[in-house]
């Protein structure tokens, strides 16, 4: 990691990611180096909406959301490394390998996500990620992300519903 610290506050994160409450899972970027790594934080609050059902009386941060938080960190790293998206483009989570969960994350924890660029090939970028609480590993994974092409402008299409007569759909059989 570099000694030249780069941080991003929530306003800058909101400018890069399309996610919003309750699905924005990166609170701050603590450090990054373009094309190399990014370290971010998620402050886990008891007020998170999913704790009502996951699990009542024993709240645990869902593992899939730990992975999503790491994926959002990879998105920020990609944007800072490759530039902002063009209108109509989307940067999306394309796959995950070797996800492992080591211990639960609970309300009050401060989860640190560390992601590193591995390689880019055929439009897919591969990253490794580690999530930690108090220096202890809670999750590791390899993630793939893809940058989509801008969508072609939609043509004006008029859709006319088929006219179906009730007696054709439900024919009435008359008894002779």
Swiss-Prot record:
Pfam families, sorted: FabA
Catalytic activity: a (3R)-hydroxyacyl-[ACP] = a (2E)-enoyl-[ACP] + H2O
MF-aspect GO terms: (3R)-hydroxyacyl-[acyl-carrier-protein] dehydratase activity
Top-level taxon of origin: Bacteria
Gene Ontology annotations of biological process type: fatty acid biosynthetic process; lipid A biosynthetic process
Lyase among keywords: yes
Catalytic residues as annotated in Swiss-Prot or TrEMBL: 54
SUPFAM superfamilies in the cross-refs: Thioesterase/thiol ester dehydrase-isomerase
E.C. code: 4.2.1.59
Keyword terms: Cytoplasm, Lipid A biosynthesis, Lipid biosynthesis, Lipid metabolism, Lyase
Entry's localization field: Cytoplasm
GO CC field: cytoplasm; membrane
Keyword Zinc (UniProt): no
InterPro entries xrefs: FabA_FabZ (IPR013114), FabZ (IPR010084), HotDog_dom_sf (IPR029069)
Family, similarity comment: Belongs to the thioester dehydratase family. FabZ subfamily.
Role summary: Involved in unsaturated fatty acids biosynthesis. Catalyzes the dehydration of short chain beta-hydroxyacyl-ACPs and long chain saturated and unsaturated beta-hydroxyacyl-ACPs.
UniProt-recorded name of the protein: 3-hydroxyacyl-[acyl-carrier-protein] dehydratase FabZ
Gene behind the chain: fabZ
């Amino acid at each position: 990691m570099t000694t030249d610290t780069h941080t991003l506050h929530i306003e800058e994160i909101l400018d890069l990611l399309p996610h919003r409450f309750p699905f924005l899972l990166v609170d701050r970027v603590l450090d990054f180096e373009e094309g190399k790594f990014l370290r971010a934080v998620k402050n886990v609050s008891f007020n998170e909406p999913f704790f009502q059902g996951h699990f009542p009386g024993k709240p645990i941060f869902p593992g899939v959301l730990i992975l999503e938080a790491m994926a959002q960190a990879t998105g920020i790293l990609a944007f800072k490394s490759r530039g902002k998206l063009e209108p109509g483009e989307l940067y999306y989570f394309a796959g995950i390998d070797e996800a492992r969960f080591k211990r639960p994350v609970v309300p009050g924890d401060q989860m640190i996500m560390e992601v590193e660029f591995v390689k880019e090939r055929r439009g897919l970028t591969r990253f490794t990620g580690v999530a930690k609480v108090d220096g202890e590993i809670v999750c590791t994974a390899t993630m793939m992300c893809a940058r989509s092409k801008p969508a072609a402008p939609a043509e004006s299409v008029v859709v006319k519903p088929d006219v179906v007569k009730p007696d054709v759909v439900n024919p009435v059989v008359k008894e002779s």
